Amino acid sequence: MAAPTAAGLCPRLRAWLPRLTQVRWSRYNPSFLEPEVNKELYQKPFNELSEEEKEKQELKAVHPIKAAPPSISSSVFSDPMISKFTNMMMKDGNKVLARSLMAQTLENIKRKQLEKYHRAPDDEKERVECNPYVIFHQALKNCQPIIGLSNITRGGKTYQVPVPLKDNRKRFLAMKWLITECRENKHRRTLMPEKLSEELIQAFNNEGPIIKKKHVLHKMAEANRAYAHFRWW
């Protein structure tokens, strides 16, 4: 005798049999809610929450919650931007090595900035940034280009048209430039964490080859602004 399917069950019985409910091969049925991974939301007092947030909290008290993705951590050292950079730096699926290189890079940044802090005069110590996470985020922000070039064909010819970049594309280009620079232009005896820490510190100070590469891209976009009318979207 064939087993009953979810399509042949009444709606009330179907809600109690999630194993027989297929929602595009999902392990959860539609009654499961998405997990809340924002740590700041849990620190807010209940009186400061908006009506929508209060309604979501009330629903979570009576509805089942999906499991959080394995990449999300509750650690204070967890950073989604550093996780994305680690994934881009990973080769052949060796994420353990990529995480180790990223941890050594942050440690090298911390050591170099502490040495600079102790060598600096007393009136300049406050201006020395020693937090490697702040340095990483600011360096990544300084490397992000504002405008890029897109190939568009008109009349059988291909033109490089300047186009504004989205936030994801800006972040991707900055990460790609940093990783490519550290892999291709480092000395064979220089380790990856040492080279990457140097590039991040230079980018934090608006210096180095990555900043020059960003300026070159902006100059090319400025030189091709005569083709900007080819962009119609």
Curated annotation (Swiss-Prot):
Family: Belongs to the universal ribosomal protein uS7 family.
Example of a GO cellular component annotation carried by this entry: ribosome
Domain of life: Eukaryota
This protein's record includes keyword Ribonucleoprotein: yes
Keywords of this entry: Mitochondrion, Ribonucleoprotein, Ribosomal protein, Transit peptide
Listed GO MF terms: mRNA binding; rRNA binding; structural constituent of ribosome
Organism, as annotated: Gallus gallus
One Pfam assignment: Ribosomal_S7
Primary location group: mitochondrion
UniProt-recorded name of the protein: Small ribosomal subunit protein uS7m
